[in-house]
């Protein structure tokens, strides 16, 4: 191209990337020659190698790609990420992680990005190790007690937030309680599980929420062994319904179900409304997140700012603060009481 027009290679490059550096007539002559020669322009991969950056940030999550477009909390989180990315003139790459760690590791190693938002990763330590080995920055969306001064995160106090909604339910007199969460243990079946305690839970977010629920009930004399932990095979309404199938049919069914997400809680409400015998047990149900559907269903829940979490995560990645402490962000949560919870029914 440069030889055909009689200019330097840098002048050809400027015609595409810095047109203000040459006259309009010269730029048009270069572009016209490119069209005649079939030259498509600078190779973006080669350009990124020369510049030392790609112009894209990655969002890691342990789920299928469709999760990013169907989960209501994820959609709002990614809205926040994309808003910040647009302000910084960069793009966003979704990096779903397969369940197998070998494939998941390759996904992190091969992602063409300048840094990562580590969002909703079940066991994130190995992912952080791979990112560090690549020499790339990252921001976690899970608050980490062991975070170093150079690590950045934006999250909530999962345990305290969960404790607040559980204390509300305990205050209504409920003592026979089920705790419902997604993927409590790797490869566990749907339905009730036997756990020695919250420390066995796989996912750090789920672990924080289940432990917070248990904290509140321990204060009223209900120990971990007296709580029914229920595993759902996915964060979806059908998965929640399948997980609680038969849960209310025994002689002493739970009078309340505390779910680790609004989506799961809505699935429990669906299951209660669709019982084959036409009866709807007087069960209190709570969620977590306060997605738009929660208000319409009258769901008691914990509100957390999804879009703010995404926006701040991307800002911390793209414009890191000079003060390391400013890179550790805890967002506020709020208990939202609605009609889905009430006093324990009298015998």
Feature locations, PLM:
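N-terminal helix-turn-helix/winged-helix DNA-binding helices
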Residues: 35-69, 88
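Hinge/beta->alpha junction and helix N-cap segments in small-molecule ligand-binding domains
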Residues: 64-74, 95-101, 145, 154-163, ...
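Residues within the alpha-helical elements of helix-turn-helix
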Residues: 3-4, 15, 36
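Flexible loop/turn connectors
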Residues: 241, 245-347
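Short beta-strand-centered segments that line the small-molecule binding cleft or hinge
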Residues: 102-157
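Short beta-strand elements of ligand-binding domains
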Residues: 93-97, 117-120, 135-145, 180, ...
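Append "Primarily bacterial transcriptional regulators
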Residues: 1-4, 30, 283, 335
